[in-house]
Design a protein with these regions (language model features):
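Glycine-rich anion/phosphate-binding loops
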Residues: 25-31, 61-67, 125-133
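Short, well-ordered coil/turn segments that N-cap beta-strands
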Residues: 10-15, 42-44, 76-82, 144-150
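Aromatic-lined substrate-binding rim segments of carbohydrate-active enzymes
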Residues: 4, 31-109, 139
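Polysaccharide-binding and catalytic clefts of secreted carbohydrate-active enzymes
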Residues: 98-100, 104-166
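Active-site-proximal loop/turn and secondary-structure-junction residues that shape catalytic pockets
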Residues: 21-23, 52, 88-90, 155-159
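Boundary/entry segment of secreted carbohydrate-active catalytic domains
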Residues: 5-27
Length: 166
């Protein structure tokens, strides 16, 4: 049987981790230095978007994805591919303020406060609607993007291969 390598440009081995450059959008020098250090460490793939919801959608219905494309382009130009994650585990403050039912209720019957990771109430219709919309928009914008090869949805614990990297 012939051995097949799924990610041939990555030598069959994905090496990297989560990367959160959205905190440095006003500092392109930091992105450049991060990429230099990633290349030095042999990183060939990073996960983007895990905590980006408040940057993607700073106000309800106002979406900004252009910064993500620029970062994906810079990474790709340096031999680093993207696993694109949905940001469902870190909701923006506006969502919790407007839809407090999106926050989990603890065993004590008290609703958790904003700012806790993965503090979502899975049965909240508004939370489910908002995460479905975000997933849909990311898939439409980046599903066929040559820089991304996996789509990660931590809320639903799966990875979806977009395409083989060759």
């Amino acid at each position: 049987m012939e051995k097949q390598i799924l990610f041939s440009k990555l030598n069959g081995f994905v090496h990297g981790g989560d990367y959160n450059p959205e905190q440095w959008l006003d500092r392109p020098d930091i992105l450049e230095e991060d990429i230099r250090m990633m290349k030095k460490a042999g990183v060939n793939c990073v996960t983007l978007g895990v905590f980006s919801w408040s940057v993607y959608e700073p106000r309800e219905g106002e979406f900004h994805f252009e910064w993500l494309k620029k970062i994906m382009d810079s990474l790709y130009e340096n031999g680093i591919y993207t696993i694109l994650a949905t940001p469902s585990g870190a909701r923006p403050a506006w969502l919790d303020k407007k839809y407090p039912e999106a926050m989990r209720v603890g065993k004590n019957g008290q609703r958790n406060h904003h700012g806790v990771r993965h503090n979502h109430c899975m049965s909240s219709p508004e939370y489910r609607k908002k995460t479905a919309l975000m997933d849909k928009l990311l898939a439409e914008k980046f599903g066929q993007h040559h820089r991304a090869f996996l789509f990660q949805n931590p809320l639903r614990d799966f990875y979806l291969m977009i395409k083989s990297v060759h």
